[in-house]
Amino acid sequence: MIWHVQNENFILDSTRIFMKAFHLLLFHGSFIFPECILIFGLILLLMIDSTSDQKDIPWLYFISSTSLVMSIAALLFRWREEPMISFSGNFQTNNFNEIFQFLILLCSTLCIPLSVEYIECTEMAITEFLLFVLTATLGGMFLCGANDLITIFVAPECFSLCSYLLSGYTKRDVRSNEATTKYLLMGGASSSILVHGFSWLYGSSGGEIELQEIVNGLINTQMYNSPGISIALIFITVGIGFKLSPAPSHQWTPDVYEGSPTPVVAFLSVTSKVAASALATRIFDIPFYFSSNEWHLLLEILAILSMILGNLIAITQTSMKRMLAYSSIGQIGYVIIGIIVGDSNDGYASMITYMLFYISMNLGTFACIVLFGLRTGTDNIRDYAGLYTKDPFLALSLALCLLSLGGLPPLAGFFGKLHLFWCGWQAGLYFLVSIGLLTSVVSIYYYLKIIKLLMTGRNQEITPHVRNYRRSPLRSNNSIELSMIVCVIASTIPGISMNPIIAIAQDTLFF
């Protein structure tokens, strides 16, 4: 009898919870419709994987890519709608958040074709790989729209857990296992530091968790200039620093880049930067509005260290992926300039524009690395010598992406950096912009060093990897080359038409 009553109570409680969740989804689901499309794609992948004995690989890729493209279409369809707060204050939808969600979806859409042949050659589990990519994308999208401390903590953890699993996906590779262990340990430590900073923010504001309510709480409690806020700022900056990977929070980056599967590195190198930048802009600009001088100083130090250390250490690297790891550390220093400038002087617009170009430049470079690695089995920079004599198309594509990363005119990277530095100069960040210009020259040096190797025709410099280079006859190469062509075009042509891109970015500058 007692068991029967308890069972009925359990059923009633479960029904209430389900009805409440259904009610929230029914009345607020339109606000997270792009995320719902991804969730439906995830469910569809799981259903196909559990019901089908034979894996239809093209069909799995089609479902993943279609769900991402449909999410992008849903975002564009609701462009310029009024900002709304939904799910009892957990999420906020506006153009500023949606532009970051668009960038994350764009990264994932371009990364999936890069992984097709790689996964087939390495015989990795396909369904799980796609599930992790889509789930990480979902976590990044929720992070961009998060409006309270709990969601801001849970969403990046969803992204991070999938990132840990993806970085260690090649379980037989010792380097991959080592990279995953370091990534997991440092990621766990940074998450604990971040949540500790949130606890100081929560207590100082009188128990508020929504971002705008935290500001109101700090005003009511007169704690907006207290030592507690300074402590919260330091801990949160360190926690976000791990996600952005500026110096000195960059130790995990080179090992993870070198040890992880190359398509995974391509995915993490852009999506993590976009998601962390979205988090940084909202956290620093809203709850720490009254501490702008303090967090400006902290970010300036991080930007200077990142630009100097990242670009100087990149010169000495012999692995292409490690070189790009240190290059990305330097690149995030440029992005931080836009975060510091903020809403004034088009700082956010310049940051968004540069990140759009960075996605195309970086993914284009990684597409070339994936293709070269599959055909030669090496990642050593020295082994790229003479590639132009065997595969001019691949060599020219890699050269264009590297030159754009370095910021040479008239490529997109040059105009992106020019606008970013100009906004920083107008905001009075003269020293920071000067460091950025000098380190950009340093980056051009090591990019040109690689391009010189690509174009060499002297037999004594060409390694056996290029001498025995053969273009793969596999049809699946087309997907990698398609992503590569799209990224190369996006790294070159948009630089000529900067004004429309900047104008679109400027339209997103409201919260």
Swiss-Prot record:
It is a multi-pass membrane protein. GO terms for cellular component: chloroplast thylakoid membrane. It catalyses: a plastoquinone + NADH + (n+1) H(+)(in) = a plastoquinol + NAD(+) + n H(+)(out); a plastoquinone + NADPH + (n+1) H(+)(in) = a plastoquinol + NADP(+) + n H(+)(out). Keywords: Chloroplast, Membrane, NAD, NADP, Plastid, Plastoquinone, Quinone, Thylakoid, Translocase, Transmembrane, Transmembrane helix, Transport. It is an enzyme of class 7 (translocase). Its EC number is 7.1.1.-. InterPro entries: NADH-Q_OxRdtase_suN/2, ND/Mrp_TM, Ndh2_N. NDH shuttles electrons from NAD(P)H:plastoquinone, via FMN and iron-sulfur (Fe-S) centers, to quinones in the photosynthetic chain and possibly in a chloroplast respiratory chain. The immediate electron acceptor for the enzyme in this species is believed to be plastoquinone. Couples the redox reaction to proton translocation, and thus conserves the redox energy in a proton gradient. This is NAD(P)H-quinone oxidoreductase subunit 2 A, chloroplastic. It comes from Nandina domestica. The lineage of its organism: Eukaryota, Viridiplantae, Streptophyta, Embryophyta, Tracheophyta. The gene is ndhB1.
